[in-house]
Amino acid sequence: VAELTPSGTFSARAIAKGLKPGLYAITDSHLLTGGRLLVAVEAALRGGAVLVQYREKSAPQPERLKQAQDLAAICHNAGVPLIINDDPELARRCGAAGVHLGQSDGSLALARRQLGDHAIIGATCHADLALASRADADGADYLAFGRFFNSTTKPGAPSAKPSVLTESRQFGKPVTAIGGITTDNGEGLIRAGADLLAVVGGLFNGDVATIEERARCFSRLFAQHHPLFSSSVPQES
């Protein structure tokens, strides 16, 4: 879909900020070693990723800033928003579109004051609709739930059932699923209500050609099964 119209969980506000259904590519420095970060993200973008998150908590600050600035330029050229994990100040300095906050990552309201009304701010809600309700009230732009499958990135994260994706659509915000997602198990999450599939290892654990092909496969899943792309696909009962 070239241009979205407000529908379901995608308000005019969300669309104006650049949010759309699809693959949410999340970087991992343990997978993207040896200077592979930029080429890997470029491959994901070629494959159709609609949102990118830079997640790096251990590198020195100057290195993080340089990587974030480079990613911001790549994403800007592709017309795709870049989100910074857990660091509103880094998001501001590198010119990213916004920030993603976990439950221990600080105040959403403070991040909003730092970044402004135009910024995209996402919130981790685990499998808890009460957390989602609070994030919604605090002005989150999207709500993230998971983990749905075993995850090597965050093996200790609380588990979630697909039904939380359906239930969370009551908030009228884009719904993100995360945790062990691959091209083989993503379809069911989209059918359950996921607007975005946030993928780490299931995307970036491979060479550049593999990353691009996996991204294309995720994009096809949305084209086939997300209601904003195809309302003719029968839904599971």
Per-region residue spans from a language model:
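Conserved N-terminal beta1-alpha1 strand-loop-helix module at the mouth
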Residues: 1-108, 113-141, 167, 172-175, ...
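Paired acidic/hydrophobic, glycine-rich loop segments that form the ligand-binding mouth/hinge
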Residues: 99, 197-198
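Short amphipathic alpha-helical segments
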Residues: 160-163, 180, 184
